[in-house]
């Protein structure tokens, strides 16, 4: 889906998580009120900037052609990060409120992003999590995506008891879909699931808070 973007810096050697999409993105920050230290971040790739960048980051991991009809109003979220001392809920709530305002200001309707599950166990937890979620949170077929490098789910244990990672749980509570089977991101040793959240599907309990 467009030109390949090369990494601008090697995270393993620079200590920085940087790639070629960063320059095309808007960056949402939460700062601590006294020290002004950055304690929470999201990066946002808007539709017109995705076109300039040669496509969405997610297209490097998935065939997202079934989402093409959404692209004029679809933003991609990435690099969600909250400082370890501020992971009590307030910071992510502020980030989500900022995202909601961004979406409403620019009249965008859909958010997508790759939600990552660590694979230190070889992928069994990720396979079990997908198996657990697919019956209740899988997207309609018209929003389905297909991994270029699929996690080999059938070769893994799909029946382990798992706890859903907090960020994925938060997206699902808002009303997000899982758009298909996980991709294996060998560079970061994670299993990535493509998440889609239409603003129109946000749970009414949260819509009153975020969509004012």
Q: Model segments located where?
A:
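C-terminal "cap" of GNAT-fold acetyltransferases
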Residues: 188-202
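Short intrinsically disordered coil segments
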Residues: 59-60, 208-212
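Active-site rim helix/loop that mediates acceptor-substrate recognition in acyltransferases
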Residues: 1-43
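Short loop segments at secondary-structure junctions
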Residues: 33-35, 85-86, 199-202
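Acyl-donor binding region in acyl/amide transferases
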Residues: 47-177, 182-192
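Long, contiguous binding/interaction regions
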Residues: 201, 207-208
């Amino acid at each position: 889906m467009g030109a390949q973007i090369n990494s601008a810096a090697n995270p393993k050697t620079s200590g920085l998580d940087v790639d070629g999409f960063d320059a095309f993105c808007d960056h949402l920050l939460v700062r601590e009120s006294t020290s002004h230290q950055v304690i929470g971040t999201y990066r946002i790739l808007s539709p017109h900037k995705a076109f300039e960048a040669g496509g969405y980051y997610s297209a490097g991991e998935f065939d997202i052609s079934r989402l093409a009809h959404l692209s004029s109003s679809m933003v991609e979220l990435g690099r969600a990060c909250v400082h370890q001392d501020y992971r009590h809920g307030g910071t992510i709530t502020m980030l989500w409120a900022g995202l909601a305002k961004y979406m409403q200001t620019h009249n965008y309707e859909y958010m997508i992003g790759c939600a990552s599950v660590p694979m230190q166990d070889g992928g069994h937890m990720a396979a079990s999590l997908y198996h657990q979620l697919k019956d209740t949170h899988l997207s309609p077929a018209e929003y389905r995506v297909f991994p270029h490098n699929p996690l080999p789910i059938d070769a893994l244990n799909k029946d382990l008891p798992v706890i859903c990672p907090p960020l994925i749980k938060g997206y699902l509570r808002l009303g997000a879909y899982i758009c298909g089977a996980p991709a294996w991101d060998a560079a970061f040793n994670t299993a990535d699931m493509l998440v889609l959240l239409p603003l129109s599907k946000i749970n009414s309990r949260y819509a009153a808070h975020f969509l004012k």
